[in-house]
Amino acid sequence: MGTKREAILKVLENLTPEELKKFKMKLGTVPLREGFERIPRGALGQLDIVDLTDKLVASYYEDYAAELVVAVLRDMRMLEEAARLQRAA
């Protein structure tokens, strides 16, 4: 079993370019736990999947980053991908 970071990376790698763009947009609207700050939208725009994964883990730590990715995927109605990440993480 891999790390949560690897699980996040694998799920994000399966998104189409349009889905990834939507994911980044929705990441800016998902409610955050107290004590965490949003990653500025401008900082997300040019990130590739590996850099986005690194930014998520650096900003929110692995556990919470995985929870956020699941929340965004659910908001996008990508329930299969969200469930896959939950099982892997």
Swiss-Prot record:
Residues 1-89 form the Pyrin domain. Keywords: Cytoplasm, Phosphoprotein, Signal transduction inhibitor. Its main location: cytoplasm. One of its GO terms (molecular function) is protein serine/threonine kinase binding. GO terms for cellular component: cytosol; IkappaB kinase complex; nucleus. SUPFAM superfamilies: DEATH domain. InterPro entries: DAPIN, DEATH-like_dom_sf. It is found in: Cytoplasm. Predominantly expressed in monocytes, macrophages and granulocytes. The keyword Transferase does not apply. Phosphorylated. Pfam families: PYRIN. One of its GO terms (biological process) is negative regulation of interleukin-1-mediated signaling pathway. It comes from the Eukaryota. Associates with PYCARD/ASC and modulates its ability to collaborate with MEFV/pyrin and NLRP3/cryopyrin in NF-kappa-B and pro-caspase-1 activation. Suppresses kinase activity of NF-kappa-B inhibitor kinase (IKK) complex, expression of NF-kappa-B inducible genes and inhibits NF-kappa-B activation by cytokines and LPS. Interacts with PYCARD/ASC (via pyrin domain). This is Pyrin domain-containing protein 1. It comes from Homo sapiens (Human). The lineage of its organism: Eukaryota, Metazoa, Chordata, Craniata, Vertebrata.
